[in-house]
């Protein structure tokens, strides 16, 4: 197995631990110092499957205080079952050690290997069983590829020729009963192992081959090679070339009649004292055998995840403990005593139906893995699983078509001039510390929290797009109210889609540029430019496919959600996707800029995020303004119906006129501009803007990320009861005035909430 894959799986375990523990800043730091790769696993269910932790996960869920992370599950498993490994085997006499010389095949060494190998020589009187237990006290963990913790992916080893197994009499009734039940259900056949060239010989006792009388030092490579000799590659041909045998072994799911091969036997192995192998035979015949499923054409990652066939080898442990079976059968996957106990418990719980054995599980998963590009539907037991999904899944096969380059000084100058009107200006602290973090208040989990004033226009626009995804797209369409109680994973997913829509729309639905921060400075500020510590570190990623854009944002969503510069990164991404040239063409006055005094968002910036164009007005289409001297000035407005609407207090004061493209959007969500602040207003009724009868009496929900809301604000709008416009405006909340620019004279009931004045 590739060490890179092992490293990525381990890193994914750490990321999952950090994510579940809420260590968001640590996650960001880890992603920056150790970026994800194509081998990274970013979905908790996938990670659990790679490590085969399904059984531990189910057991954990049944506990009163379940653990939250896979790393904790693994840790508890080892502490519970292998903390006292040395006590599992009592030693009354000195145990000889065995050394196996190196072979020509070079195998990697392990620093954790012991240099002495312990051999337990059990006599033939023990019911005819003979077993060799190697490295029991120090290297028991090497065989932890069992059913419980799950068949760790084996390393790349040279394959060996197959050999049959032999029958050993003396099975206990319980063990025989277990095999009979497995036979009836056509589950996994018994896997027999025998040395090459030997005939089947029914015996009660077997000879321990290669025993030496004294302790002999053995290198880590020797002990590692001994284990590799116990692995095997089943193949349809015994004349496989040596060059081909050095490749990654191909795994076949064999029929019930097939015999699993064991390690290749050689004269040196017999004469130099290789560990003897237990041979057990159970002959089975069944007509319903699964076909061969070679993994030859699967991608490297999928091949790496397949188990070595030797992990299906049966090992038997003889024990005299009162609380254990006299004869223990270790099912495919390694020497974990929990496997037998699980099998026995399963027989008692399910009657005659044993738990599915590892090979059948592997067959099903291999079929699914073999169909690249298809989504695998999983059995979801409860809603908790949805919350455990770690976002940012990186595709293992598909490569993103991304062109990346660092920002340069000229681009940074253009952006700053477009934002502030001068390259000497910088983002203030309100902008630098603002990202798209969600509220932890139970009734406001859908809301993005604003730290201070300034980028409220960007936050409101993103909030509207997130609500669009939460309420009216995907599975939320059937139950909009449920969309207001999203899981952490679901709301983050909706944030990804919202950001993707914004930058894709700004790029004319043809391209997008995503600006991400790095830990290195990309250029040295010189001349008429003032550094702010943000633009100088950017890397610009160009994409021309919407699907790639969504996937790319999933991988980097921490920079937007956790920050610290998420708001700045989105603003710059929208600008670069649109391009500075086209944005200046959108302006009525070419010298306009996107951020006004005190760091407030301009109407141009809000329009850029909502419609993809940084026009200066909110009316429909284009207005020709005749100055009277023959010169006509074109004032650009909104060109088409927007997904998210816009209402303004300025319209109440007759300063501007919001057109129907913004006032009647596709979705009942409006960004509200009131007294230099942007907030959000939305409805849960998707047909509110399509059926005039629903506009007689309906509810609107109000959210202000800066108002420190602690509860949901629900307004009931009644258009059948009109309010006189002559009412003293000083006592009327500005929000009501904004609402009446859309529904003239409507009454607004705050339903017990304090009106925001």
Curated annotation (Swiss-Prot):
Residues 231-242 have a biased composition (Low complexity). It holds the Pfam family MINDY-3_4_CD. GO terms for biological process: protein K48-linked deubiquitination; proteolysis. Its EC number is 3.4.19.12. SMART domains: DUF4205. Residues 141-170, 192-335 are annotated as: Disordered. It is an enzyme of class 3 (hydrolase). It catalyses: Thiol-dependent hydrolysis of ester, thioester, amide, peptide and isopeptide bonds formed by the C-terminal Gly of ubiquitin (a 76-residue protein attached to proteins as an intracellular targeting signal). The modification Phosphoserine is found at residues 219, 223, 289. Residues 254-277 have a biased composition (Polar residues). Residues 192-201, 299-310 have a biased composition (Basic and acidic residues). Keywords: Hydrolase, Phosphoprotein, Protease, Thiol protease, Ubl conjugation pathway. The active site is at residues 456, 677. Belongs to the MINDY deubiquitinase family. FAM188 subfamily. This is Probable ubiquitin carboxyl-terminal hydrolase MINDY-4.
